[in-house]
Amino acid sequence: MSPSSHKPLILACGLPLSGHIMPVLSLVHGLTDDGYEATVVTGRAFEQKVRDVGADFVPLEGNADFDDHTLDDLVPGRKDMAPSFDRTVQDVEHMMVATLPEQFAAIQRAFKKLSASGRPVVLVSEVLFFGAHPISLGAPGFKPAGWICLGVLPLLIRSDHTLGLDNDRSPEAHAKKLAMNHALEHQIFVKATAKHKEICRELGCTEDPKFIWEHSYIAADKFLQLCPPSLEFSRDHLPSNFKFAGSTPKHRTQFTPPSWWGDVLSAKRVIMVTQGTFAVSYKHLIVPTLEALKDEPDTLTVAILGRRGAKLPDDVVVPENARVIDYFNYDALLPHVDALVYNGGYGGLQHSLSHSVPVVIAGDSEDKPMVASRAEAAGVAIDLKTGLPTVEQIKEAVDSIIGNPKFHEASKKVQMELESHNSLKILEESIEEIASHDFGLLTKSDEETEDIPVKGPALAVSS
């Protein structure tokens, strides 16, 4: 559809990591198809993908312009750290908080460009793009008509009864979670929280932000969680701006089948394995999965390496019943798949379940344990509770999923639930509601006539 001058403009933002920006781009693709004009702020590694969905591109600068493969350069000592909570704390401080000024400056550059139209601009960001926070806290500069935040991760907002790891509501668990809730803000993330407040003050905010994990949930005009309710633990209280929106929309893409596509179509059973786009070593999951299933009768294993041009190490022998490809359209393969073995990314779970495919999860970093616990509680997954599973663990888990119809039945229920939520429609309704209420439109402070500078010690990456 041609762009419409009657629609509000969209400014979308996301961290330059695949799991964060790709869900945003999926929705932006739908918006541009429906006649919206969109601009996207993210890292240069994703510029072509931004343009491919019909949006204009504004790059992040400086330390904010990282990507999946340069994180170790941004966070001191990261490459030597095993996946752990300590590494997550470091990631938050250096990747999300320290880069906030550069993110905010990029948003302001984009707003300045869009302001000439005189049309309302709606800000759409993902939950960990902290550069949107100062806009809700009185910082000088251009202001959007309103802010919509997208939940591209399991819910991070605290509750008396859940920390995102289980649904235990016993008195003992309740007391433990209350203590952990306090520790998250006042001990574990105390440094990041203090730096977050300091940066916001330096940028001219007239209010202090909420706890770093929760500000986006509370301050956004609309918060759209990109999953169905069954993939979240129950909560006693959620903000009034919160809504479950289902998974991101599917888009038709050109599909050129590989030479072995006939093997997929004729196989009695197909198992897909991938480590996503941020694999450190294919020997962590893909190689042991190929080994685990090499003697399975009537089974074809398809391994997707996640990056164009990627290859398995030279010493890996690919079994006869396996096919390996560098990059592949998931939506083309998943309708033929009986089970997915993967490392627990949030988007991968939604993608798989949108085709009613149950999963085996082997992931222990970032948000992957939270994803796995939700998937297992929903009955659609087996959580191996490790990022380095053995051949025996993988074989047993795949056999269990294939041999027990309850996993496919539960996956089908979630698929139907996903289909009852139209995330693009929900987003467009939210955009139009915000624009029609004219929440400040595109305004700026009296003194703000030039680009917002990136200033202050917040730019320094401390060790």
Curated annotation (Swiss-Prot):
Catalytic activity: 18-hydroxy-(9Z)-octadecenoate + UDP-alpha-D-glucose = (9Z)-18-hydroxyoctadec-9-enoate 18-O-beta-D-glucoside + UDP + H(+); 17-hydroxy-(9Z)-octadecenoate + UDP-alpha-D-glucose = (9Z)-17-hydroxyoctadec-9-enoate 17-O-beta-D-glucoside + UDP + H(+)
EC number: 2.4.1.-
One GO MF term attached to the UniProt entry: hexosyltransferase activity
Family named by the database record: Belongs to the UDP-glycosyltransferase family.
InterPro entries: EryCIII-like_C, UDP_glucos_trans
Function comment: Catalyzes the first glycosylation step of sophorolipid biosynthesis, the coupling of glucose to a hydroxylated fatty acid to give rise to a glucolipid. Can glycosylate all hydroxyl fatty acids generated by cytochrome P450 monooxygenases CYP52M1, CYP52N1 and CYP52E3 into their corresponding glucolipids. Main products are 17-O- and 18-O-(beta-D-glucopyranosyl)-octadecenoic acids.
Listed name of the protein: UDP-glucosyltransferase A1
Entry superkingdom: Eukaryota
A Pfam family recorded for this sequence: EryCIII-like_C
Organism: Starmerella bombicola
Induction: Induced in early stationary phase (at protein level).
